[in-house]
Structures are given as C-alpha cells and as structure tokens.
Amino acid sequence: MARNTGRIGVGILIGSLVAMGATVAQRELMRRAGTRLIDWETVRGIARRRLGPYAAPLSARERAEALAFYQAALSAIEPSIQAEVGRPLPQALETPAVIDRLEWIDLNLATFRALFSRVEVLLNQAAGNAETPGKALARIVNRTIGNQQLGFLIGFLARKVLGQYDVSLLAASPGPRGRLYFVEPNVSAAAAGLRIPLDRFRTFIALHEATHAFEFEAHPWLRDHFTALIAESVEQLATDPGGLGRRLREALSGARSGHWIERLMTDQQRATFGRTQALMSLLEGYSNHVMNAAGERLIPGFAELHDRFERRNERRGAVEQAIMRITGLDLKMEQYAAGERFVDAVIAARGPGFLQRIWEGPATLPSLDEIRDSKRWVSRMEDGAASASEGRG
C-alpha cells in the first residue's frame, strides 16, 4: 500500500534528481536559467488534470458519514493495538481527516515543496554567484522535466493512496503530533473493486494507519531521526550533481549493481539510502505484524480480506509496474515483505519483548543487512548494541 508520502517522497525526490542531472545538456541549462527548481502551480495543475473524471469532490454528507465511521473505528482499534504491543499510546489519536483526491494533492505538495526547497538552497550554495551549469541546474532544470515528472507522479499517487499517517517531515513548523488522513474516494473504489464491504475495508485501512501512528507517537525520537536521514539524503544528492553523468554511464555498462536508483548514487549516498530503506522496512514490517495480529480480533474474515488485498497488489498492470520501477516505489513494496520477515523472525527466536529493543533509539535500529538476516541484529543486541555505527550497513 502506498501510504505515508513522507516516505514516498524520498523515492520520488531521488528519481527526480537523477533524471534531472542525467538528461539535461549544459547549454540548455545555461540558456533557460530562471529562479526556481520547480513551478509548484504548474505541478499542481498537471496533477489535478491527470485525475480527469476522478477529481470529483466529496459531498458534505459523504465526508461526515465517513468521518463518523473512522472515529468510531479508531476508538475500537486503539485498545487492540495497545494489547498487541504491550503498552498504551501516550494519548488518544488526533481526530482523523477524510479527504478527496484533490485535497490529497494539495496536502502532499507541501511535503514535496519542503524537500525541494532544501535541494534548491544547497544547489544554489554550491553554485555560488557565477552563472555556471551547476547554478543553472540549481535554478531551473526541473521546470521542464521536473514539473511534468512530479505532476504526473503526484496525480498517479492521488488515485492510489488509501490512507496515510502524516508526521510533517521537514516541515518548517511541524506540529507536536501527526494526523491520520483517509482518501475516501480511493478507499471506496478499492473496496468495490475487491468486493469487500466498505465498512470492513475502512476498518482494515484504519488499523494499518493507526499502527503507524503508534510507531511515531509512542517513540518521539523517531520523527527527528527519520527527518535527519531524509535531510542527509537530500544534501548528498544535491551537492554532487556533476557526477551523475559518469555514474549513469557506469550503470548502463553494467559496472554497478542494484536498483537503477542505487546504481546512480555514490557510495556515501548509497549508505544513507540504505539506512533510510532499513528504517522504512522496519516501520512497514512492524506495522503489518501488529495489523495482522490485531486484525484477526477486530475484523470478521480478516484473513480473506488480507489475501484479496495482497492479490490486488500482485495484479498491477504493465504501465503501473513501469511507473513504480522508474520512481523507485517498487523498492517500497519490497520493503513490506522484508520488514515483516524480520519482525516475525525476531519474535519467533526471542519473543515480542526482545523485539521492543528496536524502539530504544537509533543505535538499536536494524541495518539493511540485519533486516535481511535477523540473526545478526539479535546477536548485536545480545552483545550490547554497541554504537549506531557498528554492525550497520
């Protein structure tokens, strides 16, 4: 499920920067220099137009009915999550918001603006005052490629995202807590397509998003750590635009391995990207584990519902698969399975209490290698969870 767009945004940002640096000629950069990397009103217009007939707003009645259901569902869900994880939430979840696809676009443009504003500042600082290809890249390169790319992708996601727990990553003035959002037209369409009763499917989605809320609200250090990883990734990508062409040639020649996005990164960038991927895998895997355990108690026919939903993900069309490959979102889908295998393996080996060590702080988070081989993480914890830099990769 494509849910938390702070995490989705990282993949799209990386793909966008790579495409920019690898495909635009120096002369064109110089000739078309302007003032901003992205024209956000243009991006918004492209995304909204991509929705076409699916842009219909929610009526006041539809919104009120859905909101009442989600509020009641979350009241029932919270005790089940608390029972499963063995600890209470610090406080009740904020009132959720029910939104339509157009509202989702506007909500998430703020996340992308925060990401790209950091890129813009760093590229301008690196370019200095001289009118160089680097400065031109910092100022306008994506007003042709980037506007179209981001507008297309945000419009694409606006029809796919069912719900998200928004923690305002990189926001200038983030609130003390995140908020749950449900994209009701997508939830309704998915329920109908899967032939699942709407209220049962709503509860299914609300349960997953509530587990993400627990992860962040019960462990306040997590948001700062996640934000720092994203900021580090952005800085590394923005301060080395000149090497993209060389790495592109190496990737095409087969000299580099891994996903195409990873093949276009420096070793330092790949290390940071790996830490980010590991955290995303853990968050999704833990959420899925809790959801599966609590769902059996909360939702009639949960196992069948879950299987139908998973089969839906497996039946993606060729165009959708290509889009996910190009943007790096296919990496996100792979994370669900890897993270859940890690969580299940640790619980099977040492029990749920031992798994709770993941929440002690950044030093006890598993690395990407440890996500793939849980025995390595277990061994590191039993050896004293040395420093955050030891045993990580």
Where are these regions (language model features)?
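N-terminal mature-domain "stem" immediately C-terminal to a signal peptide or N-terminal signal-anchor/transmembrane
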Residues: L29-E84
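Auxiliary, metal-adjacent structural segments of Zn-dependent hydrolase domains
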Residues: A73-P185
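Post-HExxH zinc-binding segment in Zn-dependent metallohydrolases
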Residues: N147, G151-Y165, F216-I299
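Short pre-active-site segment immediately N-terminal to the catalytic Zn-binding motif
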Residues: V187-I205
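Active-site recognition of the HExxH zinc-binding catalytic motif
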Residues: F201-P220, V343
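Pan-zinc metallopeptidase signature
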Residues: A271-G393
